[in-house]
C-alpha cells in the first residue's frame, strides 16, 4: 500500500500519550488492521499499536494542532510490507468530541458506553461495531462489512452498507436512516414500542410479531413517534 497525506513533516512517529483537555476532534486513517476506540474520563490518554518492533516509517504518525488530533497509518509515501498483526490500533479518546474514522480492510470497534458530539466512520471491507453510543449525529458507511450496533441515542443517524447487515438497538432519536443493497436490517427494540418506519425495498420483506398499521411503504408501530427510514434492495427488515 502507498499512503500519502499533506504536511507530512509536521507528524511524529510512534505510540504516544496526550492530554484530554487539548483535544476536541480525533481523525483516524487506517488500513488492513483493527481499530479499537475506548472512551475515558482520565486526564491523560494513550494511543498504541499492537507491535513496538516497527520501523520509524512503519509506525503510526500523529499530529495535534488547534484541538484536532490526526492519526495516520504510517509515514507519508511509505511503501512496503508490515509484520502480520503489528498494526492493530487501540486509542483512548475523551468524552464529547468529534470522531472521524476512515479505514480500508479494517474492523472498527467502539468499546463500552461512549458519548460524542459527532461520529463518522467510513469503511471499505471491514465491520463496524459499537456497544453504546450517544451523539448528536452518527454517520456510518461501510461497503462490504456489517454494522453491529448496540444501544444508539442520536438526534440524527445515517447507517449505510452495500453487502453487509445492519443491527442496532435504537434507544432515543429523532430520525434514523438505514440503507443496504443486499444486507438485512435488524432493529433490536423500539423506543416506547413506537415508530413510524418507511420501508422501501425491491425483494425484501418485513419480519415482525409486533402489531402495526400499514399505508403503502409506511409501517406504524404504537403511536409512531420515532421516525426510521429503511431502504433495501433485497434485504429484509426484522424487529
Predicted regions and their residues:
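Gram-positive cell-envelope targeting signals
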Residues: 1-8
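A short, Trp-centered hydrophobic/proline-enriched beta-strand micro-motif
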Residues: 26-28, 46
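Short, surface-exposed interaction patches in beta-rich subdomains
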Residues: 132, 138-141, 147-239
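Short Gly/aromatic-enriched secondary-structure transition segments
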Residues: 41-51
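Right-handed parallel beta-helix
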Residues: 11-25, 34-38, 42, 57-139, ...
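N-terminal short leaders/motifs
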Residues: 16-19, 53-54, 77, 184-193
Amino acid at each position: 500500500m502507498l499512503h500519502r497525506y499533506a504536511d507530512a513533516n509536521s507528524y511524529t512517529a510512534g505510540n504516544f500519550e496526550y492530554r484530554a483537555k487539548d483535544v476536541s476532534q480525533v481523525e483516524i486513517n487506517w488500513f488492513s488492521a483493527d481499530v479499537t476506540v475506548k472512551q475515558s474520563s482520565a486526564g491523560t490518554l494513550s494511543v498504541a499499536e499492537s507491535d513496538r518492533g516497527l520501523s520509524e516509517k512503519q509506525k503510526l504518525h500523529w499530529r495535534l494542532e488547534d484541538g484536532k488530533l490526526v492519526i495516520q497509518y504510517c509515514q507519508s509515501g511509505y511503501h512496503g510490507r508490515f509484520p502480520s498483526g503489528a498494526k492493530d490500533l487501540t486509542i483512548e479518546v475523551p468524552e464529547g468530541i468529534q470522531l472521524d474514522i476512515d479505514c480500508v480492510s479494517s474492523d472498527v470497534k467502539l468499546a463500552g458506553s461512549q458519548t460524542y458530539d459527532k461520529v463518522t466512520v467510513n469503511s471499505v471491507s471491514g465491520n463496524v461495531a459499537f456497544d453504546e453510543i450517544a451523539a448528536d449525529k452518527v454517520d456510518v458507511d461501510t461497503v462490504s462489512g456489517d454494522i453491529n450496533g448496540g444501544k444508539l441515542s442520536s438526534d440524527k443517524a445515517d447507517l449505510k452498507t452495500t453487502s453487509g447487515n445492519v443491527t442496532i438497538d435504537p434507544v432515543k432519536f429523532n430520525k434514523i436512516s438505514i440503507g443496504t443493497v443486499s444486507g438485512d436490517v435488524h432493529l433490536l427494540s423500539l423506543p416506547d414500542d413506537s415508530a413510524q418506519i418507511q420501508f422501501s425495498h425491491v425483494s425484501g420483506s418485513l419480519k415482525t410479531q409486533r402489531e402495526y398499521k400499514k399505508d403503502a411503504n409506511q409501517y406504524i408501530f404504537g403511536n409512531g413517534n420515532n421516525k426510521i427510514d429503511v431502504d433495501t434492495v433485497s434485504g429484509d427488515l426484522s424487529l
